Amino acid sequence: MVVKAEKPFAAGGSIEMQLDGGNYEIRPASGDRIRISFGGNTGSATADVTTVGTHANLAIKDTPHNNFKATVEVPQTTDLVLHLTAGNLEMAAITGNKEIDSKAGNVTVAVGDSNDYSSVDASVAMGNLEAGPFRRADSGIRNHFTWSGRGKYTLRANLGAGNLELKNK
């Protein structure tokens, strides 16, 4: 993996990500920073991060259509809004609100403790929905569930076609 972009960013902020198709891993950074690394076939892909106060915009564009991989490291406590064109996403347990949209692919989100959430809204138009921490599993067409708890964070995940898995770790 080759580092393509890196910026300091304090924990507790919010990051909005626009990701072209590919295989992505989102995980906690070793400190208060955003770091983007590319691997596999990087082609002419680019990474851009802009920050204003406690908000950051991150874009990965012009990704090739075969074997593109990227790792995005963010502070352990961060609110995330993520838009993925298509591909595979694996998100480690990041503390904060999460909003994830993907048209197609496989999305796996480590939610940590389900008691940290006040509301969960997850849907898959065509495919499998596994949400073990929230005691829910469905497959087929138009899978959707909502869940309410006593925590302070929200999780919204919407996938067009593929598999959506919400897991503890």
Identify the residue ranges that each predicted region occupies.
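Gram-negative (and chloroplast) outer-membrane scaffold detector with strong preference
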Residues: 69-70
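Extracellular beta-strand/beta-solenoid scaffold signature
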Residues: 2, 66, 140-142
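Short linear S-[DN]-x-LW-Φ motif typified by the pepsin-like aspartic protease active-site region
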Residues: 1-51, 109-111, 118, 156-169
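Short, surface-exposed interaction patches in beta-rich subdomains
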Residues: 49, 55-57, 61, 92-94, ...
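Membrane-spanning beta-strands of outer-membrane beta-barrel proteins
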Residues: 9-10, 75, 115, 150
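Active-site alpha-helical segments that house and flank conserved acidic catalytic motifs
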Residues: 15-17, 82, 122
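A mature extracytoplasmic/lumenal domain signature
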Residues: 19-21, 28-32, 38-42, 62-64, ...
